[in-house]
Curated annotation (Swiss-Prot):
Gene from which this protein is expressed: IRE3
Cellular component GO terms, alphabetical: root hair
Keywords attached to this entry: ATP-binding, Kinase, Metal-binding, Nucleotide-binding, Phosphoprotein, Serine/threonine-protein kinase, Transferase, Zinc, Zinc-finger
Catalytic activity entry: L-seryl-[protein] + ATP = O-phospho-L-seryl-[protein] + ADP + H(+); L-threonyl-[protein] + ATP = O-phospho-L-threonyl-[protein] + ADP + H(+)
Binding site for ATP: 834-842, 857
Stated name of the protein: Probable serine/threonine protein kinase IRE3
Single annotated GO MF: zinc ion binding
Span of domain AGC-kinase C-terminal: 1112-1216
Active site residues of this protein: 951
Organism name: Arabidopsis thaliana (Mouse-ear cress)
PANTHER family: SERINE/THREONINE-PROTEIN KINASE, SERINE_THREONINE PROTEIN KINASE IRE3-RELATED
CDD domains the record matches: STKc_MAST_like
Cross-referenced InterPro entries: AGC-kinase_C (IPR000961), Kinase-like_dom_sf (IPR011009), Prot_kinase_dom (IPR000719), Ser/Thr_kinase_AS (IPR008271), Ser_Thr_kinase_AGC (IPR050236)
Modified residues (Phosphoserine): 32, 1010
Length: 1235
């Protein structure tokens, strides 16, 4: 039909002027085509159907008037993009001729139903005149919505009356007939000074016979009312047919105004809650500011260094309180992130607590904003576009249908500006937390000028919580679970929230501003800031981290707390290959074999799950450890460890020893190869003994022991395809030929494939990620080795792939090529010196990555070689590696440098019994009984393992923070006499008169001791060199018990020769009995000090010692759980006041200087894990830890220290478990690291 085509063409001409259909993105419910398709008739129908603009019904005679209103000067038809509303008088200009010619001069009215126009921009119900009114004529009278007319009239008082008589209008005005035949669009938002020029733009109009009808007073009144600026949003304008039957009419499928209205209500409700939360934040900030002022006044003189930071917090609190809710909506995330960055950089103390408190206040708003963006951020864009009036501004149209280039196009382009609301934009990120506390006024359109494209982009959907740091792979799953829980708690479950969060986690590095360049940099920075604080001891860390993750002490990577036990076992299994003294290819192949065996066991376990018992469903321990038999033969006979060949091969058995711990320990057995299990793991320093002679039952199986036995089930069984891929990648990398030109590219390809496999993991911190990380480090290590072999011409490959080079260099730093350099003294921060020993000294140090405190025994290589002490230190290390007893000090690392050896052990702050006796004189018999009983249990364990201490004395009995005893210093153990040519001649022993106050010169005397050990505590057979069996330790126990009760050793004298005579002749000065010593105590001491070792008490085992009447009140099974009489009360984690050397020392920097008048008496006894032997040589200076340059120096091949480096995986796993088991305790309580 000609009329129909012209009708559509006329509509197209009027709509083509809308800038929203040209440059603006499509809004919700809109699908307008591009400008190049404007002449296609079909596009008009589609636009008419999808356009969200509502219609007003007007008579056909209204075309002339509407064209007069629609026409305006070219300069005024273009408006600015600000979206501001302004009222402008209607300017009437002649309509363009081309438009008039296209419309017929006279056309008979046609029912809307005949053209299908009843469905344009209306609900799909029946026609109003057919369903509501029973008029006999062919033309029904449309009903105007009364609520709109009343609102329009009240908004324009100049219309002449405050009400419109709707009744006469309906019955008498013929211009409003045929509601479906003529419609015009009302755009209530009038932008710019020319805003009223397009108030009424007819889309479909007809030129009827009566040209004077437009001059009707009623029509003019209606025109003025509908032309007035209004405050309602376009979404609130509904078509007539919708209003006639708003309830019960099915919504139009392409446009859902009721849904959008409901969403607007929800968003308005959220903003209202945000405003209320902002008021509460303001109140809390004012109270917080008052507290800051009080703290400022109190610390003005005592702590001036705190004042600057407190002033900054005051300024920030005041600024946030004065910020309006709308501005705070945009800026709160940036403020919180900057504040959290500063908090992580602060050490524990008042300032960090103040930052935490302010974060607690401000995050009340950020949490609400986070919930809003995660739930409704994408849907809000369409509402904001509609509310802003940009897409519906009437001043964007001109009669010719062409879009002007000037301001109109700039308005459309403004819509493409990145969202300032999401991810807090560049303005928010640029807020400097000190200099930028002032609030920058945001542009008026900033909260709204967002496009649908921006909102649909995963990088621009709100960043979960954009102030939080980029989550590490280990904590990603935990964060998703936490967000999901928050969504469920709020009973808002929008679809695909989890998918959005995953996409956000992957794309945040790209979406973030240049300050945070990549996810890797953010993760490393987070780990560095979070864990470089003075946590020190690990026993009482409640708030492990904000994201429920800890740093694994084995791999030193962040892992979720839910997988600590499984990860510890898996990580220990993967880490052992870095312990092996083999090449990269062998280690890669070993990893591949292990992965294949794990996969086979998982498949076998699944096939037998239906018929096997729960124990049978566990993974086979033997199959997981078979590969160790190939790499390192096991040492089955511990009795051989005292021999020379055992010392030669023992470094090769370090990992088999550990794997025996993992796989060969029977469940809940009383006696194990490595000693009894601890009932509380690291939770107590004295958990009891489970040796066969005195089993101490535990209340529950030790999770760590079960973990190391391999009895835990794998939780990532569904990842075995990825395990197979990891094994293939490891084999491929191992088979890369070093001389092949394609080896570099092959390794790079393996790295790329490896990262893809790791990214596809289903679980964090378990087999795929843990083994994948190990394989990656090994491949990078081999990559460096190959690069070193390439000539300069081929070395340009490294420069062509700079990111991979950065990764390789980073990997080399964490996993060096040389085995002995895997850990160094540079990984520790030296805090202070604790004591001085024969070959070095003991220092208190803190691990840089974890903050744990350790006692490091520093030994000089040259002194040990010169004094023939090499075997003794190797034996001590081996004993500590294998020790598994709550009364024996724990060992964690050993490493070496060019000058020194380092033994890293647990730091026990209670001091030693020599220091205690020096302060309090002697012990009462009840307390001495308990302490000696714990020593008996420690010796029972050591003797059952074939270890003889041979240097027991109060100096080597340490006090843990819970007051229980720990045995240390095994330097003379197993090896016997170090140098039989050393004599005992020299000045008087320091132990001769420990508590004689009338000898004040004791600290300044030149005290010497033999390399054999302290003469006062040595058994006769050791002095004579005729024997050095286990009974020698029981002799020392009798000496120690005597000293506990009396205050001095029984054989003390002024000269070593006199001590020698007293020991051989058994000259004992007994105190009065029973006044100062009970009969039971004297009898026990007398039997322990029997000259004949075969007749000595304890010659037939510890059982006869424990059965003595002196211990009749001791409950050997619960001794570890009993509360000690003395519990150390340290001021802080670094307090070493309980240690008192036999000499006085001045600490300056990292050096210990003797206060002795004789400079050659620079040797002191050990106080924490160091040997008590003193040298007769006078040229031994103070040990200083090696620096980086010294560390790189290789050790001579003639020195037997090449395989000295070791990482005690099982003890590190205990720390992981202890962090979890002690997580509920108050972190403010001072506590020191313990097992």
């Amino acid at each position: 039909m000609v009329f129909k085509s012209k009708l559509f063409f006329s509509s197209k001409k009027s709509r083509s002027s809308s800038p929203s259909s040209s440059n603006s993105p499509r809004s919700v419910g809109s699908d307008s085509p591009i400008r190049s398709d404007k002449k296609k008739p079909k596009s008009n129908s589609k636009e008419e159907t999808r356009s969200p603009n509502t219609k007003k019904h007007v008579s056909a005679k209204g075309k002339e008037a509407s064209l007069e209103v629609h026409s305006s000067s070219p300069g005024k038809s273009n408006s600015s993009s600000s979206g501001s509303e302004a009222k402008k008088p209607i300017t009437e200009t002649p309509a363009t001729s081309d438009v008039k010619e296209e419309s017929p001069a006279s056309v008979s009215p046609i029912m809307a139903s005949s053209l299908g126009l009843n469905r344009i921009k209306t609900r799909s119900g029946p026609l109003p005149q057919e369903s509501f009114f029973s008029f006999e004529n062919d033309y029904a009278i449309p009903v105007l919505p009364c609520y709109k007319l009343s609102k329009l009239d009240t908004g324009k008082k100049e219309a002449g009356s405050s009400k419109v008589d709707i009744g006469p209008l309906r019955s008498s005005n013929p211009a409003l007939l045929a509601s479906g035949t003529g419609q015009f669009k009302v755009s209530p938002t009038i932008s710019g000074p020319e805003g009223s020029a397009e108030v009424c733009t007819p889309e479909n109009s007809y030129d009827l016979d009566d040209p004077k009808e437009s001059d009707s007073p009623r029509y003019q009144a209606l025109l003025r009312m509908t032309s007035a600026p209004r405050k309602r949003f376009p979404g609130d304008i509904k078509s007539f047919s919708h209003e006639l039957n708003s309830k019960g009419v099915r919504p139009f499928p392409l446009w859902k105004p009721r849904r959008l209205n409901n969403l607007e209500d929800i968003l308005n409700l959220i903003r209202t809650k945000f405003d209320k939360a902002k008021e509460e934040v303001n109140s809390d900030l004012f109270a917080f500011g008052g507290d800051l002022l009080d703290i400022y006044d109190k610390n003005k003189e005592s702590h001036p260094e705190l004042l600057v930071t407190i002033e900054d917090l005051l300024v920030l609190a005041k600024t946030c309180a004065k910020t309006t809710s709308k501005e705070f909506w945009l800026q709160c995330e940036g403020i919180v992130q900057d504040l959290d960055d500063r908090r992580q950089e602060l050490p524990p103390g008042v300032l960090k607590q103040l930052h935490t408190r302010m974060l607690f206040i401000l995050t009340r708003c950020t949490r609400l904003l986070q919930f809003h963006k995660e739930s409704w951020g994408q849907e809000e864009d369409a509402v904001q576009l509609r509310q802003s009036g940009v897409l519906h501004s009437a001043d964007k149209r001109d009669p010719t249908g062409e879009v002007r280039d000037g301001k109109g196009s700039s308005t459309a382009n403004a819509l493409k500006v990145p969202s300032t609301k999401k991810a807090y934009s560049q303005e928010q990120r640029g807020l400097n937390w000190i200099e930028g506390f002032f609030v920058r006024p945001a542009p008026l359109s900033s909260p709204y000028n967002e496009t649908s494209k921006d909102s649909e982009s995963p990088a621009n959907i709100d960043k979960m919580s954009s102030w939080k740091r980029l989550p590490s792979p280990a904590s990603k799953g935990v964060q998703e679970a936490a967000v999901s829980k928050e969504q469920n708690d709020r009973k808002v479950e929008p679809p695909q929230v989890v998918k959005k969060l995953v996409a956000i986690s992957d794309d945040m590095a790209v979406a973030k501003l240049p300050e945070v360049s990549s996810a890797k940099a953010s993760q490393e920075h987070m780990s560095k800031n979070r864990h470089n604080i003075s946590w020190g001891y690990w026993g009482h860390q409640s708030c492990i981290s904000e994201e429920s993750s800890i740093i694994c002490r084995i791999c030193e990577e962040e892992i979720p707390t839910t997988h600590v036990e499984d990860h510890s076992r898996i990580c220990a299994l993967a880490d052992k290959y870095d312990q092996k003294g083999v090449g990269v290819d062998e280690r890669l192949m070993a990893v591949a074999v292990t992965l294949e065996k794990i996969t086979d066991n998982v498949i076998q376990k699944d096939s037998l799950a239906a018929v096997e018992s729960p124990e049978g469903m566990k993974i086979s321990n033997a199959s997981l450890t078979e590969e160790l038999d190939v790499l390192s033969p096991k040492l089955s006979d511990w009795s051989r460890r005292g021999s020379e060949d055992m010392l030669d091969c023992f470094p090769e058995t370090d990992n088999s020893v550990f794997m025996d711990d993992m796989g060969c320990l029977p469940s809940m057995s009383c006696r194990t190869r490595f000693g009894p299990k601890s009932d509380q793991g690291m939770a107590t320093s004295s958990a009891g003994s489970m040796t066969p002679r005195s089993p101490i039952p535990t209340p529950r199986p030790d999770p760590i022991e079960l973990l190391l036995e391999g009895k835990g089930t794998f939780h990532d069984q569904d990842d075995f395809p990825q395990m197979s891929e990891l094994a293939d990648i490891a084999r491929c990398a191992a088979n890369a030929i070093p001389v092949d030109d394609q080896s570099i590219q092959l390794l790079l390809s393996c790295l790329e494939d490896l990262r893809v496999v790791i990214d596809r993991r289903k679980f964090d911190a378990l087999i795929v990620e843990t083994f994948g990380t190990r394989i990656e480090k090994l491949i990078q290590e081999k990559y460096l080795q190959l690069c070193e072999l390439m000539d300069d011409e081929k070395g340009t490959i490294i420069d062509e792939d700079a990111p991979l080079e950065d990764d390789v260099v980073r990997s080399l730093r964490t996993s060096p090529v040389h085995l002995r350099d895997r850990i160094s003294i540079d990984d520790f921060e030296v805090m202070k010196s604790i004591s001085r020993g024969a070959f070095g000294h003991v220092i208190l140090a803190r691990k840089n990555t974890t903050g744990d405190l350790f006692a490091i025994k520093v030994l000089r290589k040259a002194d040990m070689i010169r004094k023939n002490a090499v075997e003794s230190i190797l034996a001590e290390r081996d004993i500590l590696i294998n020790a598994r007893n709550p009364f024996v000090v724990r060992f964690f690392y050993s490493f070496t440098c060019s000058e020194n050896l380092y033994l890293v052990m647990e730091y026990l702050n209670g001091g030693d019994f020599y220091s205690m006796l020096r302060k309090i004189g002697c012990l009462d018999e009840a307390n001495a009984r308990v302490y000696i009983a714990e020593v008996v249990l420690a010796l029972e364990y050591l003797h059952s393992e074939g270890v003889v201490h041979r240097d027991l004395k109060p100096d080597n009995l340490l006090i843990a923070h819970d007051g229980h005893v720990k045995l240390t210093d095994f330097g003379l153990s197993k090896v016997g006499l170090i140098n039989n040519t050393d004599d005992l001649s020299g000045p008087v022993s320091s132990a001769t008169s420990l508590l004689v106050e009338e000898k004040p010169k004791l600290p300044t005397l030149d005290h010497k001791r033999s390399a054999v050990g302290t003469p006062d505590y040595l058994a006769p057979e050791i002095l004579l060199g005729t024997g050095h069996g286990a009974t020698a330790d029981w002799w020392s126990v009798g000496i120690i018990l005597y000293e506990f009760l009396v205050g001095i050793p029984p054989f003390n004298a002024d000269h070593p020769q006199q001590i020698f005579d007293n020991i051989l002749n058994r000259n004992i000065q007994w105190p009065p009995v029973p006044e100062d010593m009970s009969h039971e105590a004297r009898d026990l001491i007398d039997r322990l000090l029997t000259e004949d070792p075969h007749q000595r008490l304890g010659a037939r085992g510890a059982a006869e010692v424990k059965q003595h009447s002196f211990f009749k009140d001791i409950d050997w099974n619960t001794l570890a759980q009993q509360k000690a009489a003395f519990v150390p009360d340290s001021e802080n984690a670094f307090d070493t006041s309980y240690f008192q050397s036999r000499y006085s020392w001045n600490y300056s920097g990292e050096r210990c200087f003797p206060t002795n008048e004789n400079e050659d008496s620079s040797e002191g006894d050990s106080l924490c894990g160091s040997s008590g032997r003193l040298s007769n040589h006078h040229d031994e200076g103070v040990d200083i830890p090696c620096g980086p340059a010294e560390f790189e120096t290789s050790v001579s091949e003639n020195y037997p220290f090449d395989n000295f480096s070791f990482k005690n995986l099982s003890q590190l796993a205990y720390i992981n478990y202890n962090l979890m088991s002690k997580g509920h305790k108050d972190e403010t309580q001072p506590s020191l690291q313990r097992r």
